Amino acid sequence: QSFGFEMITVPMTPTGPDMDLVEQLVKDPAVKGMWCVPKYSNPDGIIYSDETVHRIANMKPAAKDFMLMWDNAYCVHEFDGDFVPFEDILTLCREAGNPDMVFEFASTSKITFPGAGISVMACSEANQAYMQKLMGIQMISYDKVNELRHVLYLKDKETTLALMKKHAQVLAP
């Protein structure tokens, strides 16, 4: 809102955002984007269904500069049970003819240390070229020592998921 955006609240269903409403809203060229937390979405912990993810990827927004911000903040946060995989939004958007519509984000800040984690962004090659221009003037270098700490500590998917189980033991009532 600080940037002049009017935020539109879309009700959640057990399978994700109300896609009938979303599909109506994106017909308006004034609607410029959508922010999604597809896994364990706050406050209810909803995981978007495959059908919902497919519908999002296949949207045809009226705004040519529409951006889908895919905030994968909780991608490995299985405290109970097994890892819950879900559809790859980048591939689905590309297959739907929307390769430049989506930016996917994640970080380790809710895994290792809040505010000191490392972040990742995934997007199309065209969006990557654009973002590299923007980021190139904003930073001299990444914190390579912190990146190394994370690589050595987290190692791989299995180690990371095991760490999340340890977090669950601490956080459980």
Model-assigned labels for residue ranges:
Residues T9, L68-W70, H150:
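Hydrophobic residues in well-ordered beta-strands that form the structural core
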Residues Q1-V37, H54:
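PLP-dependent aspartate aminotransferase-fold enzymes
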Residues M19-P29, S41, I46-L68, N72-P114:
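Active-site pre-lysine segment of PLP-dependent enzymes
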Residues W35-S41, E158-T159:
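Short glycine/proline-rich turn/loop motifs
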Residues T91-A172:
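Conserved core segment of the aminotransferase class I/II
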Residues K32-V37, M69, V120-A122:
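Structural motif
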Residues I8-T9, S41-D44, A162-H167:
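Surface-exposed cleft-lining segments at the edges of enzyme active sites
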Residues P11, P38, N72, A106, ...:
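Active-site proximal loops enriched in glycine and acidic residues that flank catalytic Cys/His/Asp
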